[in-house]
Structure formats: structure tokens, C-alpha cells
Amino acid sequence: MRFQVYILHLCFFILVVLTYLSQGQSYTTTTTTSTTEQPTFLQKIHETFKKVKENAKIHNLYIFDPPTWIYTTTTEKPVESTENFDITNRQLITVPVRCPPNYDFIKGRCREKIP
């Protein structure tokens, strides 16, 4: 399951890089080159792969696999302060049963008519 999350992160970041390139937006690199040239497409993808690896190593990212428990400072109400509902006095509604054509209602069931 964890491997699938890495693949999803990787696909998402590749999609982001392709979106930036298709829209012609500038993309700043974190490489330590002193040239003023724009990085090539492969360099951008390589940097994105590095970022995906770094993000995958961080276990606090729960985008696709949320934690099962969360810290909270609130307390639950005690049981005696909750309202108890009386369900013994409920009223049931009886609805007539409708049978399809060529069927009769016999002994609580729809049965086919015998000619």
C-alpha cells in the first residue's frame, strides 16, 4: 500500500511539472549552477523526482493514507448527560402489499394465479 502512495505522489509531481512547462511559467531550480540558463526539461523532471523522494520519506504527509487516530483536547460528554430515547412507543405503519399482474396475495405472499 505504501508503494502505491509513492507512485501516486510521483505521478502527481510529474503532472505538475508538465503543467508548468505547458503554461510557459518559469520554474526556479535548486541546483548550485552559476549559469543563467533555464534548466532543461529532463533537469526539471530530475529535480521533481528528488522532491518526491524527500516528500515520501516524511511520514507526516497523509494525503492518500490518513492516520487512524488523531490527537484531540476535547472530552466526550458523560453517558448520563446524553438523552435517552424511548423506542417502545413507536407506531408502525402497515402498508398494503401490491402484487404484480397475474399474481394474488395469499397467506402473506404474492403467488402466481393458476388458470
UniProtKB/Swiss-Prot annotation:
Q: What induces it?
A: Up-regulated in the fat body after injection with bacteria (B.thuringiensis, P.larvae or E.coli) or the fungus B.bassiana.
Localization per Swiss-Prot or TrEMBL = Secreted
> What cystine linkages occur within this chain?
C99-C110
Listed under GO biological process in this entry are: antibacterial innate immune response; antifungal innate immune response; defense response to fungus; defense response to Gram-negative bacterium; defense response to Gram-positive bacterium; killing of cells of another organism; venom-mediated depletion of circulating fibrinogen; venom-mediated suppression of fibrinolysis in another organism
Q: What domain of life?
A: Eukaryota
UniProt keyword annotation of Membrane present:
no
Which residues form the pro-region? 25-90
The record's Pfam families line, in alphabetical order, gives: Secapin (PF17521)
Q: Which UniProt keywords apply?
A: Antibiotic, Antimicrobial, Disulfide bond, Fungicide, Hemostasis impairing toxin, Immunity, Innate immunity, Protease inhibitor, Secreted, Serine protease inhibitor, Signal, Toxin
Q: Which residues form the signal peptide?
A: 1-24
MF annotations from Gene Ontology? serine-type endopeptidase inhibitor activity
Give the temperature dependence.
Answer: Antibacterial activity against P.aeruginosa is retained between 25 and 90 degrees Celsius.
Disulfide bond as a keyword? yes
Q: In which tissues is it expressed?
A: Expressed in the epidermis, fat body and venom gland.
Family, similarity comment:
Belongs to the secapin family.
Q: Mind telling me what this protein is named?
A: Secapin
Organism the protein comes from = Apis cerana (Indian honeybee)
